[in-house]
A protein has these predicted regions:
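Surface-exposed loop/interface segments of Gram-negative outer-membrane beta-barrel transport/assembly proteins
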Residues: 1, 24-29, 35-125, 143-244
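A generic beta-sheet turn/junction motif
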Residues: 6-10, 19, 42-46
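A common structural microfeature
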Residues: 12, 127, 139-143
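Transmembrane beta-strand segments that form the barrel wall of outer-membrane beta-barrel proteins
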Residues: 17-23
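Long hydrophobic segments that form regular secondary structure
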Residues: 133-138
Length: 244
């Protein structure tokens, strides 16, 4: 983390940033987080302005093989051959392989993890908050605030056609790609007038008048494709068709 500030009594500024890399429980679960902000404060007479801009960038890399698949692969299954080769299928407890009974087939999670599959996402967000405070008289206080935020996210998941889940799928439908994008936009603000005065050291009058505005919008788009050739052909341009 880093934060630097300076200025004078009338004008203050500060900017900072932070970076954090979080390793998940599973080896391929990684989260990179970057945050930055710029703070400005300006005072002139009875008027005070302040503005804060925040930027957040997050990248996720998720395991392509869920923990449940590793848990399903019982410890007595040999995950590699004596030569250290990772095979596609695990042994059966009776050491008989019968592709005719797909319900008995147990895929090797190490095989699936070594393929060109990926599950990743990224997020970018920016927010600006503006504040105004004005006290023209001792008995009158005016405060205004306005904030606007924009956030975009993109999630991509590709599963290789060589993955065990496609073993019983026809050739032109093996492999899948999914992309989901979302845009969020929002703003909110409020204005408050506060009046308070004492008359004749005995009577007090207080009044508050306020108004607020806000709006939120979200747009989501998705795209899917199936049917990929074997190898490192992981973009939708190599797909065969849209899913049925």
């Amino acid at each position: 983390n880093l934060y630097v500030e300076g200025g004078s009594e009338q004008f203050r500024y500060g900017f900072g940033g932070s970076y954090n890399k979080i390793q998940g429980v599973m080896k391929s679960s990684i989260r990179d987080i970057f945050s930055g902000n710029l703070d400005l404060l300006y005072r002139v007479g009875k008027l005070t302005f302040s503005n804060k801009i925040s930027v957040d960038v997050t990248k996720y890399t998720n395991p392509v093989v869920p923990f449940s698949e590793y848990a399903h692969a019982n410890p007595y299954y040999p995950k590699r051959t004596v030569d250290g080769i990772v095979e596609k299928w695990l042994e059966y407890k009776d050491n008989e392989f019968s592709a005719t009974d797909a319900s008995e087939i147990v895929g090797n999670p190490l095989w699936n993890a070594a393929l060109s599959s990926y599950d990743k996402s990224k997020m970018f967000g920016v927010r600006n908050n503006f504040n105004l405070e004005y006290r023209p008289f001792d008995f009158l206080y005016i405060r205004g605030r306005f904030g606007v935020a924009k956030q975009t996210s993109d999630s991509e998941r590709f599963t290789s056609p060589e993955a065990t889940e496609f073993d019983q799928v026809e050739l032109l439908k093996k492999g899948s790609y999914n992309d989901v994008r979302r845009d969020d936009f929002s703003y909110d603000g409020d204005l408050t007038l506060t009046y308070g005065q004492i008359f004749n050291d005995a009577h007090q009058i207080n009044a508050v008048l306020g108004m607020s505005i806000s709006e939120r919008k979200s747009i989501s788009k998705g795209f899917s494709a199936v049917g990929f050739p074997e190898g490192n052909y992981t973009t939708p341009g190599f797909s065969n068709k849209y899913p049925d």
